[in-house]
Amino acid sequence: KSTHGLTVVISPLQSLMKDQVDNLVEKGIEGAVTINGLMNPIERADAMERVKNGKASILYISPEQLRSKTIERLLMSRNIVRFVIDEAHCFSAWGQDFRVDYLYIGDFIRKLQKDKKTERKPIPVSCFTATAKQKVISDICDYFYKKLDLTLEIFASKATRENLHYTVLHKETD
C-alpha cells in the first residue's frame, strides 16, 4: 500500500486524457497514467500496477470508471490527495445529457471518504471548465455543497484567451 498521494483527474474524453498524460511525460513527469477503455489488457494492467505500487501520482479516468469495483478497490488502496474534475460544466443540466456519470462523482467521493474514514478531513476537489456561464457555475457549486457539504472557491479568468491564435488558410479544391 503506497503512502504517496494520488491525484485523481476525472475527464470525459479518452483522447484528451492520453494527450495530457503524453504532455506530462514529455515534460519529464513520469508519474501520470490513464486507465480507459481504449487500452489493451496489458496496458491496463501496467497502468493499474503503477497506481497500486505508488509509481503513479496522477491518474486520469472517466467518470464511468468510478462505477468499476476494480477502480474502487484500487483507489481505496491509495492515499487520495485531490480529485480534479475536468469539463466540470457536465454537472449542469445540459451536460447531464452528455455524461450522466458526472452526477455519480460526489456519491463516489462521499463513499470513498466514509470507507477510508477520512470524513473529518475531506479530500479536496478542484473543478475546471472554460465554458461555464454563471448559472452553470452555480450548478457546480450547489452540487458539491449538497453532495459533500463542500463550498467551492471560484477563480475566474477573462473570456479572452490571448494564448489562442487562429489562422485561416484558403485551400483550393478540385
Q: Which residues does each predicted region cover?
A:
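Conserved Walker A/P-loop ATP-binding site and its immediately adjacent core
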Residues: H4-G28, T34-E43, S62-R67, T131-I137
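Conserved helix/coil segment N-terminal to the catalytic DExD/H
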Residues: D22, M39-R82, C90-Q96
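Conserved catalytic network of the ASCE P-loop NTPase/AAA+ motor domain
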Residues: K1-T3, L24-K27, E49-G54, R73-R78, ...
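Post-DEXD/H (motif II) to motif III coupling segment of the RecA-like Helicase ATP-binding lobe
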Residues: M76-S77, V81-R82, H89-A156
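Motif I (Walker A/P-loop) of helicase-class P-loop NTPases
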Residues: K1, M17-Q20, D101, G106
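Conserved interdomain hinge at the start of the Helicase C-terminal
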Residues: T167-D174
